[in-house]
Amino acid sequence: LMYHAIHVMAPGEEANANLIVDPTTFESHLKALQEAGYYAVSPEEAYKILTENVLPQGKKVVWLTFDDSLWDFYDIAYPLLKQYQMQATNNVITGTVGQEANLSLEEMKEMKEHGISLQGHTVTHPPLATIEASLQQTELADSKTYLDSNLSQDTISFAYPSGSYSEETMAIAEQNNYKMALTTNEGLASAADGLLSLNRVRVLPYMTAEMLLQTIATP
């Protein structure tokens, strides 16, 4: 699942309306997922499932991803995720860490101890398919280095900014030891699509919990 912002939309935010999910709606999603028996996976667990096709304890699984490392993830989404005991992944634009509208390194370190994974979303959020290879290399390498060193981890996944990528981008991702890359292509993730071009279901503001469960139900 792909989320971005979780907050009550303020006046003047209409242009980004499709990226903003109301906290009440978000909580209804978590409650419905929990009641339907979904287990929220970490990137490492997602990778294992996609490569070995083995589900943990035979459960239904969902991967909750949030793009752009926005302030409200810590203030609003994170407490709800903890309340419902759901793991989640935030894809971090490393060049924005510590800015007022974004997560700080301290917040990320705290959340990492409580079931939140911080993965890549480049340094400056450029549409990768439109920039030259050397710049793509810098964006993918530097963001991974930042997360690896500051969070003492091996960053294995990232999301393409604005869903922009090419065959060249995927090759550069592989060279930089990313095991998975997330697109904005609509659909359920499957290894058949390639681990560096995984689909996601975009969560829109008007999606009720019932709609969400229908969208992710597998035959």
What residue spans do the PLM features occupy?
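C-terminal active-site subregion of NodB/CE4 polysaccharide deacetylases
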Residues: 1-64, 71-72, 129-219
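Short, well-structured secondary-structure segments
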Residues: 1-2, 22, 39-43, 82, ...
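Surface-exposed cleft-lining segments at the edges of enzyme active sites
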Residues: 64, 93-96, 126-129
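Residue-level marker for buried hydrophobic side chains located in beta-strands
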Residues: 64-65, 118
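Short, glycine/acidic-enriched loop or turn micro-motifs at the edges of active sites
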Residues: 70-71, 124
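Acidic (Asp/Glu)-rich catalytic clusters
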Residues: 78-86, 103-120, 174-175, 189-193
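Charged helix-capping and loop-helix junction motifs
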Residues: 101-106, 135-139
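Substrate-binding clefts and substrate-entry loops adjacent to catalytic sites
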Residues: 119-131
